[in-house]
Amino acid sequence: MLAELGACLLLAMVLLDSDPGTQAMEGVKCGGVLSAPSGNFSSPNFPSLYPYNTECSWLIVVAEGSSVLLTFHAFDLEYHDTCGFDFLEIYNGASGDKGNLLGRFCGQVPPPPFTSSWHVMSVVFHSDKHVASRGFSAGYQKDVCGGVLTGLSGVLSSPEYPNNYPNNVECHWLIRASGPAAVKLVFVDFQVEGSDECMYDYVAVLGAPGPAHGHHYCGRTRPPTFVSLGHELQVVFKSDFNIGGRGFKAHYFSGECQEVFTAVRGNFSSPQYPGAYPNNIRCHWTIRLPPGYRVKVFILDLGLEEPNSLTRTCDFDHLAAFDGASEEAQLLGKWCGHHLPPPVTSSRNQVLLLLHTDRSTSGRGFSVAYIGVVPMNVSCSRTDFQILISAQALAPLERTKVYLGSRSCAAQEVGSNFRIQARFDTCGTESQRRNNTSVIVSVLYIDFSTAGHDDIHEYEVRCEPRRKEASAHLLSGSDLLGPYAATAEHLQEAPPGDEAEVLEGPGTMVTQDTSDIVFLGLCILAGVLMIIAIVVLMLL
C-alpha cells in the first residue's frame, strides 16, 4: 500500500513539474492532486459565483492499471462560441501536453462522462476578468469493472488481469466513438472458464453485425475482431461462483483512430494532424484492396517523438506497417522521428498501419498516401507490346478505361482479361536510350475517375527489343503523393511464371520472348542434320 502511494506521489510530482498546476488570484485556493479511489471537487466558491482571473488544475491519479471515470453534477460557466473566456479543459493524462486534450467546455451544458485510457486524468478551470457564473461540481472514481469509454483508443481487461479474475462479477463497458465513426475491438489475450455454450463465465459483445452480436465466448480461443455497425460497442463480462482464469485483455479503436480503406488510392493522417497527436493511444488503419493487388505506401510527412538516444530504435512513439491485416503479419517498416522513409510495397492486398504513442512527448504526427498496384502481365517481342490485366481486378471498369498512350489504343476484352496488343510505331511509344541500352517506352493509363473526381493511374511500360524483356513501373504523377509526385518508383519485379499465375499474383511482371531462341535452335539442328546427310552421301 505504501509502495503504491509512493508511486502515485512520485508520478504526481513528475506530471505537475511539467505544468504550473494551480495559478489563481491571491487568496483563492483550488486544484491539487487527487489520489483517493474516488472523490469530488468543484470550482472555487461553488455554488456561489467563481472569482475572476483564476486558473485551477486538478491531477487525478489512481492505481496503476485502472482508469478514471469523470462525471459532472453541475455546470455553469460563461458562454462563448469557442470557449475563449471562461472554460474547463479535460485531459487524458497531464495537462501540460496539449496532445492529451479531450475537450474544452463552457456554457450550461455539462460535459459528458469521460473515462481515461490510463490511470491519470487532469482537469483545468480558467476564468477571465469579466463575467462570473456558478461554476461546476464533478466527481471521479477508479473504474475497475465497466464504464463508458470515449477515447480514441484504449485497453479494457477483466478485473485483476493478468491475475485470475474474481468470482460473481458482472462488468459492462460501453465503447462510444465520436460522431458516426465505428468502433473496432481486438482481443489480444483470452482465458475464461470454458463450458458448452459458455453458460458459466463468458464475454459477450453487443453492437457487432451478424451472428457475432451477443454471442458468448469462453475458453482459450480469442474471439474475432469486432467492428461496430454504429458508433457503439457494448462488452459484457460475467463470472459465476467458482472456477476462474486469467481473464482477457482487449484493445479498442474508435473515430479517426481506426479506419478501413478500400479505394485503390487514398490518404490519411494521424489524429489532430498537423496539430499534436494525443498521448497514450494505439491506432489502426487497414488498407484492403481486391485480390491480386499490392499496396504501395508513401510517408508524406513524419513528425513523431525521436528514437531512443541509446539504442537509436523507435521504442517510444512510432508508426509501423504490417504486410497483412494484423500485427502478427510480417513487419514492413517501423518509423519515428522526422526522417522520411522510402515507400514500402506489400506482397499482398492488405496492409495494416499502426500508430503507438506513449504517455509523454507528442509531435505533429504523420501524413500517408497509398496506391494500389494493379496486377498485370507485360511482355514484348521485337515489334510490339502485349499487356494482360484480369478484368476482375479492375471491376467495374470498362475496357475503354484502360489504354496505352492514348484513348485510341484502348484494351480489348479477351475472355476474362483486358488485352492490349500494340506495335512499337503506335500508341505513343518512343525509343529512348537508358544505361547505354535502347528501350521502347510508352505509358499505360488506367482511369478510375468518378463523377467530379479525376483519378488516373499511370504505369510506364518498357521493352528492351534486343532481349525481348518487358516491365511496368508505377508513375507517381498525382498531388496526392506529395514529394514523390515527380518520381517514377520501380516496383519489385516478380519472377516470370505461368500466365494464369501471373494474373493472380503480384502486379508487375518481367517476361521474356523466347521465340527467337527456339527458332535459332531449330536452325542449328537443321544445319547439323544437313552436314550429316552430306557426309553419308560422300561415303556412299
From Swiss-Prot:
| Residue ranges crossing the lipid bilayer per the database entry | 517-537
* Cystine bridges: 30-56, 83-106, 145-171, 198-218, 257-283, 314-336
SUPFAM superfamilies to which the protein is assigned, alphabetical: Spermadhesin, CUB domain
Going by the UniProt annotation, this protein carries glycans at 40, 267, 377, 435-436
Q: Which residues lie on this side of the membrane: Cytoplasmic?
A: 538-540
Q: Which residues form the CUB domain?
A: 30-143, 145-255, 257-373
User: Gene Ontology cellular component?
Assistant: membrane
InterPro entries from the xrefs?
A: CUB_dom (IPR000859), Sperma_CUB_dom_sf (IPR035914), ZP-N (IPR055356)
Swiss-Prot/TrEMBL keywords: Disulfide bond, Glycoprotein, Membrane, Repeat, Signal, Transmembrane, Transmembrane helix
Translocase among the record's keywords?
no
The stretch of residues making up the signal peptide is: 1-24
Spans within the Extracellular topological domain? 25-516
Which protein is depicted? CUB domain-containing protein 2
